[in-house]
UniProtKB/Swiss-Prot annotation:
It holds the Pfam family LRR_1. It comes from Mus musculus. Gene3D superfamilies: Ribonuclease Inhibitor (3.80.10.10). LRR repeats lie at residues 47-69, 70-92, 94-115, 116-138, 139-161, 162-184, 186-207, 209-230, 231-253, 261-286. Keywords: Leucine-rich repeat, Repeat. This is Leucine-rich repeat-containing protein 30.
């Protein structure tokens, strides 16, 4: 007991701790700075990447020491209260994965264009109304998630993201799929659910590598025939729309495999649409029955 009291008394007299007031709990990076240690000691060195994480720290600003951690390749600043991403982020040119989801960001600095090694960028759950055209200069980007923001358009230059494979634009304000998206030939995952879409452009057929396409919970009125030409599709989710008819060519999507009811399952998701008769009964009967009906209808 005496030893513990002695330590507590010593801490109370520490001028560095007194400067921080009565705060009882210190994060690892607070303690490192208080003790005068090199912040690089906080870096986690894995087999493939050097990573650094400041998740759920309640931060409104990013600590300046971070911009000196030039080795960092995976940076996780998610679930804080950040309102600004400073231009200094451009110094971290080795970053491969950057997670900024769950903050209060309204914009991104143009200096993101300097992150030439960036492959994965998470911007989910922020307040972004636009993204800078300079982001398209990150030509190695493969995964871009911007769900739950306030976006209604993308820069035309995004067509230059030729290596992009996965794009999540769900829960935004898009009235149509941006034209630049149809230039992303390597795209195998596209999520545009919970937007304001009324149709799917014929250009969807340009996405020949697409395996997963989610457009649930929109106001889509028709199922375009051109979508039937994307024969690589393994999961197609059009739940909760206003679709009344299905194209006769739907049977061309042979990789769908089945009518799916679980959101995570591969297959055709077409529930909660005002399908005209006899389509609801055919859907209930399974994909084989539905395809057989559509084939006969097309050839008779």
């Amino acid at each position: 007991m005496g030893t513990k009291q002695s330590r507590a008394s010593s801490n109370d007299k520490d001028p560095k701790r007194l400067l921080l007031g009565k705060r009882q709990k210190f994060s690892s990076w607070d303690d490192t700075l208080l003790l005068g240690k090199d912040p690089r000691s906080l870096l986690k060195r894995g087999m493939r990447h050097v990573s650094f994480s400041l998740v759920t720290k309640g931060m409104t600003d990013i600590p300046d020491f971070l911009w000196g951690l030039l080795e960092v390749q995976k940076l996780n600043l998610s679930h804080n209260q950040l309102r600004v991403l400073p231009p200094e982020v451009g110094r971290l040119t080795r970053i491969v994965v950057l997670n900024l989801c769950g903050n209060c960001l309204k914009s991104l600095p143009r200096e993101v264009s300097l992150l030439q090694s960036l492959k994965v960028l998470f911007l989910n759950m922020n307040c972004l109304a636009e993204v800078p055209a300079e982001l398209s200069l990150c030509r190695n980007l493969e995964v871009l998630s911007m769900s739950h923001n306030c976006l209604s358009q993308l820069p035309a230059s995004f067509a230059d993201l030729s290596r992009l494979r996965k794009l999540n634009l769900s829960n935004n304000y898009f009235a149509h799929i941006p034209l630049c998206v149809f230039s992303l030939k390597e795209l195998d995952f596209l999520h545009v659910g919970s937007n304001r879409l009324k149709n799917i452009a014929e250009s969807i057929q340009c996405l020949a590598s697409l395996q997963i396409f989610i457009a649930e919970s929109n106001n889509i009125h028709s199922f375009p025939r051109s979508l039937c030409l994307v024969t690589s599709l393994e999961l197609l989710n059009l739940n909760n729309n206003d679709i009344q008819t299905l194209p006769d060519e739907l049977y061309l999507l042979c990789r769908l495999g089945r009518i799916a009811w679980n959101p995570m399952d591969k297959g055709l998701h077409i529930s909660h649409n005002p399908l005209s008769k006899p389509l609801p009964e055919l859907v209930e009967g399974g994909l084989e029955m539905l395809y057989s009906y559509l084939k006969d209808k097309k050839h008779n």
